[in-house]
Regions:
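Short, helix-capping/interhelical loops that line the mouth of catalytic, cofactor-
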Residues: 1-2, 50-105, 111, 120-121
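Structural signal for well-ordered, non-membrane alpha-helices
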Residues: 12-15, 19, 48-52, 100-114, ...
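Hydrophobic packing residues in well-ordered alpha-helices of helical domains and bundles
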Residues: 3-7, 96-99, 139-142, 146
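C-terminal interaction segments
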Residues: 202-235
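An N-terminal domain-cap segment
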Residues: 1-42, 51
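Globin-like tetrapyrrole-binding proteins
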Residues: 116-118
Length: 235
């Protein structure tokens, strides 16, 4: 499926990026207040290991629910905290080794989720309060999360992200489609850069021109937003 092909490519790009970081870059503060680069990728590693193992997934969800009950935090925040805390002993080299090793198993595990399970609804409480199908979580959210954290890492450490229309452009187009569905208003959107494109819905609506990555960052809560750009799209 396309979703798993995109996740395979995203994991490859993530590993390539992390392989090139020096010691100072691993400790660079990201725009996620609780995380430097290493801790951000401990979270991603945890998500990948949960995708590769049903047992690990069940363990993480149980621990996250306990943390939510104990600390009154959203389940998503509790899950991320568990993923980081249980891997915080890993050095950057160990983290990278484990991520490389688990990457193909993650894609295989997620791709084998039965259709009946994919249709099951799961409640989420951040950044929106609604119910998602498990298939949406597996195919869309896990991909967007990895992609945005790759962008976060580049912005924390300097340089430019590796972007292409067939990969990043596809992710951005999917974000635009969901954004349009969530606000339901007419618009004209011109996204620049390798991941960009032109998008129009209806007539007479608001008009935007901006970098494609910046657009996604704003919708993910990583920048100032006004008008239709205040519409939350989960990452």
């Amino acid at each position: 499926r396309e979703a798993m092909a995109l996740q395979t490519t995203e994991l490859e790009r993530a590993v390539s990026l992390l392989r090139g970081l020096d010691a100072d870059q691993w400790t660079a503060q990201t725009n996620c207040p609780d995380w430097d680069v290493r801790r951000m990728w401990l979270h991603v590693l945890g998500a990948c290991e949960a995708g590769a193992s049903v047992r690990e997934n069940i363990h993480q969800m149980r621990a996250a629910r306990s943390r939510r009950k104990a600390h009154g935090v959203p389940l998503e925040a509790g899950l991320s905290a568990v993923q980081v805390a249980e891997r915080d002993h890993l050095s950057p080299a160990q983290l990278l080794h484990r991520l490389q090793a688990v990457a193909p198993e993650t894609v295989t595990g997620r791709s084998r989720t039965p259709s009946l399970m994919r249709s099951m609804k799961v409640g989420v409480d951040a950044p929106v309060v609604e119910k998602w199908s498990l298939g949406y979580l597996i195919d869309v959210i896990y991909l967007r999360d990895m992609w945005m954290h790759r962008i976060d890492t580049v912005r924390a450490t300097g340089g430019d992200p590796v972007l292409s229309g067939d990969h990043d452009g596809r992710i951005v187009a999917d974000v635009v489609a969901e954004w349009a569905q969530r606000h339901g208003e007419p618009f004209t959107l011109e996204l620049t850069g390798a991941a960009g494109g032109s998008f129009v819905a209806g007539t007479g609506g608001a008009s935007f021109t901006m970098d494609a990555v910046d657009f996604c960052s704003v919708l993910a809560g990583r920048g100032e937003a006004t008008g239709l750009l205040t519409t939350i799209v989960p990452f």
